[in-house]
Amino acid sequence: MTDPLIKRSGIQEEEDLTTLKFPRDLKDAKFLLNSEVAILLEHRKGISESEGTEFPQNTLLIHLYYNSINDIIRTFHKTLAYAEKFSRYKNKTSIKQVRTALSKQNLEEFEIASLANLCPEISDEAKSLIPSLKKMEDDELQAILDELSNLRKFN
């Protein structure tokens, strides 16, 4: 399925998730697992708390208004809550095991993060959620999903 044309910087780019064609600004993006986001945000929160601020002042632009700062803080906490709620893997070791297992497969970075975040149970579900996986045979994809399921059980 092809998404509508998106206009960026005066140039029209076509996005197509079935072929993993992303806009230029996402070309070299690192796709994260929700669990990785949660760990990063918890770390940032810990730094803030040790500095005695809700949000580290050195990362804010001085000209931001009070309401904007509150919006940033509120967004930070909402993002952290979301990432924690939907984290499938609770520690760095589990995340590393999942990334290592999926990296051994013939998967793109986006597919790795999507599979780890969504945790589909069967290949048809995975292909519906992540259209680029339609290139894979069902039994090959199911083996990957079964391995992911086993890793989650021991998490």
Swiss-Prot record:
Q: Which GO terms describe its cellular component?
A: cytoplasm; nucleus; RNA polymerase II, core complex
Stored Pfam families: RNA_pol_Rpb4 (PF03874)
| Top-level taxon of the source organism | Eukaryota
Q: Does the keyword Protein biosynthesis apply?
A: no
Recorded GO terms, molecular function?
DNA-directed RNA polymerase activity; nucleotide binding; translation initiation factor binding
As for subcellular location, the record says: Nucleus
Q: Which UniProt keywords apply?
A: DNA-directed RNA polymerase, Nucleus, Transcription
Major site of localization recorded for this protein: nucleus
What transmembrane ranges does the database entry give?
none
GO BP terms: namely: transcription by RNA polymerase II; transcription initiation at RNA polymerase II promoter
**SMART domains with a match to the protein in the record:** RPOL4c
Family, per the entry? Belongs to the eukaryotic RPB4 RNA polymerase subunit family.
Q: Which PANTHER family match?
A: DNA-DIRECTED RNA POLYMERASE II
Complex formation: Component of the RNA polymerase II (Pol II) complex consisting of 12 subunits. RPB4 and RPB7 form a subcomplex that protrudes from the 10-subunit Pol II core complex.
Q: What does this protein do?
A: DNA-dependent RNA polymerase catalyzes the transcription of DNA into RNA using the four ribonucleoside triphosphates as substrates. Component of RNA polymerase II which synthesizes mRNA precursors and many functional non-coding RNAs. Pol II is the central component of the basal RNA polymerase II transcription machinery. It is composed of mobile elements that move relative to each other. RPB4 is part of a subcomplex with RPB7 that binds to a pocket formed by RPB1, RPB2 and RPB6 at the base of the clamp element.
- The name on file for this protein is DNA-directed RNA polymerase II subunit rpb4
Q: Which organism is it from?
A: Dictyostelium discoideum (Social amoeba)
